[in-house]
């Protein structure tokens, strides 16, 4: 029974009839291609609609979850009770001098392309990261010795009470896969990056080089959520997993990638349960062998199947 159907008309008044989906399978909205239904999924088209939706949820004690591209997200098979607010249609990007300003739902690849067109360097490391900028800032995403903290100037955020304010780089308190946004449960609305002038060909060649390395080393041909585990201090997760003999290990349709042990992939027909069971199996085996605790980098939400 979807207890939030009574609020459909109110959400439609905020975001429009075409932007409210009922009992929507989350496997359509995550890069893992798994996940049960969300009671409601809405796609606001303005920041004001985001604010109004959050206030409606707060005033009626409706649980809500923000997602961008769903590329670092695992939704359990029982789905999500409450409302998913998807930032898909909040992707505006503008360039002002050496700054790039992007709404939270803008894919990192689009932001990189806009920076490239304007001969602005600094974001090359992010060009192959499949997520949206809001999620990237929230977890201080990084790759190839670069991370968001190196290029961000500020972020406009909203809190659970609907207050909108600006956080500068220091206030964002960005660390390894962490931020003040996670700590205080803020939601990113807009991000300003401060980049540097560079040569078009220099930027382009760096992007092409990093993308070539990704294609060579990562199992991009299968659904996944990127690196499954955070890097444990003093170790590399993929090496620990490989040295435990788990490369290629499978449970149901989930597999530790044979190409890169740091990735758990959906080899075909996996459930969220398969992936979660494999994550736990890997964690237990690595702990047994090396006494190292692997923490997931992927965000896990939703209900177990009854």
From Swiss-Prot:
Pathway info: Cell wall biogenesis; peptidoglycan biosynthesis
Any one cellular-component term (Gene Ontology): cytosol
Keywords assigned: Cell cycle, Cell division, Cell shape, Cell wall biogenesis/degradation, Cytoplasm, FAD, Flavoprotein, NADP, Oxidoreductase, Peptidoglycan synthesis
Keyword set includes Hydrolase: no
Domain of life of the native organism: Bacteria
GO molecular function, one term: UDP-N-acetylmuramate dehydrogenase activity
Reaction(s) catalysed by this chain's protein: UDP-N-acetyl-alpha-D-muramate + NADP(+) = UDP-N-acetyl-3-O-(1-carboxyvinyl)-alpha-D-glucosamine + NADPH + H(+)
EC category name: oxidoreductase
Active site residues per record: 177, 227, 297
Keyword Cell wall biogenesis/degradation in record: yes
Pfam family, any one: MurB_C
EC number in record: 1.3.1.98
InterPro entries xrefs: FAD-bd_PCMH (IPR016166), FAD-bd_PCMH-like_sf (IPR036318), FAD-bd_PCMH_sub1 (IPR016167), FAD-bd_PCMH_sub2 (IPR016169), MurB (IPR003170), MurB_C (IPR011601), MurB_C_sf (IPR036635), Oxid_FAD_bind_N (IPR006094)
Subcellular location: Cytoplasm
Xref: Gene3D superfamilies: 3.30.465.10, UDP-N-acetylenolpyruvoylglucosamine reductase, C-terminal domain (3.90.78.10), Uridine Diphospho-n-acetylenolpyruvylglucosamine Reductase, domain 2 (3.30.43.10)
NCBIfam families for this protein: murB, PRK13905.1
Its biological purpose: Cell wall formation.
Family: Belongs to the MurB family.
Name of the protein this chain belongs to: UDP-N-acetylenolpyruvoylglucosamine reductase
Protein encoded by which gene: murB
């Amino acid at each position: 029974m979807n207890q939030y159907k009574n609020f459909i008309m109110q959400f439609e008044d905020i975001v429009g009839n075409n932007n409210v989906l009922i009992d929507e399978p989350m496997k359509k909205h995550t890069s893992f291609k798994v996940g049960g239904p969300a009671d409601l999924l809405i796609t606001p088209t303005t920041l004001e609609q985001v604010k109004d939706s959050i206030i409606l949820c707060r005033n009626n004690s409706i649980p809500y979850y923000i997602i961008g591209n769903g590329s670092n997200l695992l939704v359990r098979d029982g789905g999500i009770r409450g409302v998913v607010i998807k930032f898909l249609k909040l992707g505006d990007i503008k360039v002002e001098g050496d700054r790039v300003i992007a709404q939270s739902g803008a894919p990192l690849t689009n932001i990189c392309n806009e920076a490239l067109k304007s001969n602005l360097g600094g974001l090359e490391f992010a060009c192959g990261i499949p997520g949206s900028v809001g999620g990237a800032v929230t977890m201080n995403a990084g790759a190839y010795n670069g991370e968001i903290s190196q290029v961000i100037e500020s972020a406009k955020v909203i809190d659970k009470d609907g207050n909108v304010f600006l956080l500068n780089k220091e206030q964002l308190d960005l660390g390894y896969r962490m931020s003040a946004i996670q700590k205080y449960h803020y939601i990113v609305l807009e991000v300003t990056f401060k980049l540097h002038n560079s040569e078009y060909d220099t930027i382009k060649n760096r992007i092409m080089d990093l993308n070539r390395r990704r294609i060579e080393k990562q199992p991009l041909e299968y659904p996944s959520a990127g690196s499954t585990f955070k890097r444990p201090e003093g170790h590399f997760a993929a090496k620990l997993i490989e040295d435990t003999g788990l490369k290629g290990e499978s449970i149901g349709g989930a597999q530790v990638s044979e190409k890169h042990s740091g990735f758990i992939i959906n080899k075909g027909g996996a459930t969220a349960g398969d992936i979660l069971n494999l994550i736990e199996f890997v964690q237990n085996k690595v702990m047994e062998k090396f006494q190292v605790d692997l923490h997931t980098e992927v965000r896990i939400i939703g209900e177990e199947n009854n």
